[in-house]
Amino acid sequence: MKLPITLLTLAALSFHSLAQEESLTPIFNGRNLDGWNTDDALVASHWLISDGQIIGDNPDKKGSVLWTKANYNNYELNLYFQTDSPDYDSGVFVRGPSHQVQIGVSRSLKIDLTGCIYCPKDLQGKYPIQSDKVKTTHKLGEWNALKIRVINNRIVTHLNGELINDYMTAAMPKEGPIGLQVHAGVHQKMRFKNLEIQPTRYDEPGVVEPQYDGIPVPVPNGATVLFDGKDLSLWRGMPRKGVENPAGEVRWKVESGFMQVTPRQGGITLKEPLLTSGHLHIEWATPAEVTDQGQGRGNSGVFIQGFPEVQVLDSFNNKTYHDGQASALYKHAPPLVNASRGPGKWQKYDIHFSRAEVENGKVTKPAYLTVYHNGILTQDKIPFLNRAQNGGLSLQDHNNPVRFRNIWFLPTE
């Protein structure tokens, strides 16, 4: 059943409302390290239990990580940490060793990164550096409350009740263990207690009535038309695996005011970059004849300025994974709701994005991405720290003859 929805209702939807939360469960019983890997010699010599606390102590200045035996996917982790060490470098690894929530002063960057995300091998390139809130929120020598929320490729941290970081990674493992670290190079004694985890899962996005009738939207004053329905002179072709295209030949066809993907011949990309923040409007339609299901049904995508793919898919009565539906940020964030029209019907995306602001190599304002699908808010100002700003705009060939029309860009800078 489709549900009526209003802008007020949509404004009330949040990142937290996407997920159904289960009860909090201790991952440390306060007595021993049952449930933690203790086979490693460094673990045995560096970690102990006292007064209901896990204590990491490295007088030899060697590094060690205490890992859970269990792997975790999406969750909220709550814990307390404390140290009397004047110099310390610790952290909590999420889903294995690639992404860490830092505690203390980074040995490499020489600044307090508590609550920030340390992931130097992230495909985004640079990773978030110190949050100004750390300076006033982190209580040295006292117990600090750390909350870590991991949903798909997003990591959100709160320190003593204050939001410190909201970070969308380029890629991270689907699941993995949680690790407590004492870093090499400095003697430190880290204390952890009250470690509790709350697994989360996504519900199927609710189906709502689209607020779009399929009529082309007029181009506003000041907008640049990127496809007028006549030719693809502003675009060039892209190679794909097994298909060479050194000359950038566009192999899609144009007819009746729309362009159409030629399956397995490569996507297309705009020749000139979009160098400002702005509003991208694009209309699209999946094939009217349904010949497949899931990800094989009207699949394409919109890539803009290095943000994750805005998924194009026939999601009308079509079950698939939540972060692969129409208007999902593919494998990053599912849509708030499913606002899809039926197969063969024209649909529209209005994608609003702002570029990150950087001063002296430090991000002072993250990039943001908001998506409206058929007039309904489906991605609400998703932040991206240090997202590569390459200015590109590309449309994907995912083996389906998806159509596009009426593409324009309105700068907001």
Where are these regions (language model features)?
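Bacterial Sec-dependent N-terminal signal peptides
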Residues: 1-21
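Carbohydrate-interacting regions of secretory-pathway proteins
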Residues: 20-413
